[in-house]
């Protein structure tokens, strides 16, 4: 697969994960979400998948989007996958409501 096709495939998979996060979170408040174990596991798994997918982009693709905190995305993935017990779900909610929309917008812009 060519780099361009590979990057596009990864971008679309990340957008699918974001769509899942949006569906899981729609209409729910922080207190409700942070108390819901099923939500926690679903959201964290999608965030892990986003972090894992981000490692598969080519360096050129990553460099073209400096506004995205790639290192932080990968770092969260590592914490969530290996040190799940220390996750602060208030921070996860903040990520879902503040960071995911900007990631979505940047990924969508790359497809235009």
Label the predicted regions.
Residues 1-112:
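Solvent-exposed interaction patches of small proteins and small membrane subunits
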């Amino acid at each position: 697969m060519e780099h361009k096709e590979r990057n596009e495939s990864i971008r679309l998979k990340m957008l699918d994960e974001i769509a899942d996060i949006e569906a899981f979170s729609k209409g729910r408040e922080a207190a409700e979400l942070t108390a819901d174990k099923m939500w926690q596991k679903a959201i964290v798994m999608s965030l892990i998948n986003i972090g894992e997918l981000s490692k598969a982009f080519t360096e050129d693709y990553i460099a073209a989007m400096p506004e995205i905190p790639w290192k932080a995305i990968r770092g969260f993935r590592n914490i969530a996958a290996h040190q799940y017990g220390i996750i602060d779900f208030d921070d996860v909610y903040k990520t879902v409501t503040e960071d995911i929309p900007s990631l979505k917008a940047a990924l969508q812009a790359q497809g235009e």
